[in-house]
A protein has these predicted regions:
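Short, exposed beta-strand/loop patches in secreted or surface proteins that constitute
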Residues: 39-48, 71-72, 149-152, 168-174, ...
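Terminal targeting/leader modules
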Residues: 2-4, 8-16, 20-29, 41-44, ...
């Protein structure tokens, strides 16, 4: 029997950018902090720039996926975001809800990092997936050990030598049992412990250096991940 039920994920946060800058980031700038979304055309059912945006996709049998952003200006060039992700999960409702909720917190944290450190800079986006062996339980910790950040906490500065990639001077801007964020002077590295949600470990690279090469980046990091999960 298909477990088909509606869900709603609500997240409230403050962001280091004006509503206008947040609006730009969540509409046209998603490769800078999440992933490209232009391959999924959505109908904007509400578009009141820069305060209220609702984007919705619909499918057969009543399926839908909807994102709502409500933005309020705050002092100091900041904004308050009220975010609501709603829709229908068709299988493993509890597992999908858990995964989507935790990804939401990490993505919106990354949005804040982008707005604070790289807002408006051109980005080269790269998505890399680890081998299928990374779906096993407890393997995200193996990645942290291979990177050299297993003992590091959020806010720590680290000097890393990544096999096949090179040296990274970074701040650990996010770290928990499922996700890791590293920020260098010109790049955001996002690591996803999706093994906890039944999928391989993955990562994204958001390169603001002006010299990014998605193909070379993908090759280097894929080689590293293959060694970690050999």
């Amino acid at each position: 029997m298909t477990d088909k039920r509606e869900f709603e994920i609500v997240y409230d946060t403050e962001l280091p950018g004006t509503p206008e800058r947040v609006w730009e980031a969540v509409t046209r700038g998603t490769p800078a902090w999440m992933f490209p979304t232009d391959q999924w055309p959505a109908v904007k059912t509400v578009e009141e720039r820069p305060s209220h945006l609702v984007s919705r996709m619909e499918g057969p049998d009543g399926w839908f996926n909807q994102l709502e952003h409500v933005l309020e200006p705050l002092d100091g060039g900041r904004a308050r975001l009220h975010y609501v992700h709603s829709g229908i999960f068709t299988d493993d409702w509890d597992g999908q809800y858990d995964g989507a909720s935790k990804h939401t917190a990490f993505y919106l944290h990354t949005l804040g990092q982008y707005l604070k450190h790289f807002d408006g800079k051109p980005v080269v986006f790269t998505d890399v997936q680890a081998p299928a062996a990374s779906q096993a339980p407890e393997v995200f910790e193996r990645l942290k050990q291979a990177l050299g950040v297993a003992g590091s906490a959020q806010g720590d500065t680290v000097e890393l030598e990544v096999d096949g990639v090179g040296q990274l001077s970074a701040e650990v801007d996010f770290s928990n049992e499922n996700f890791l964020g590293l920020r260098t002077a010109d790049t955001l590295y996002r690591f996803f412990g999706r093994n906890a949600f039944g999928a391989p470990v993955g990562m994204t690279v958001h390169d603001f250096s002006g010299q990014g090469d998605a193909e070379a980046t993908a090759k280097a990091w894929a080689g590293f991940l293959e060694k970690v999960y050999a």
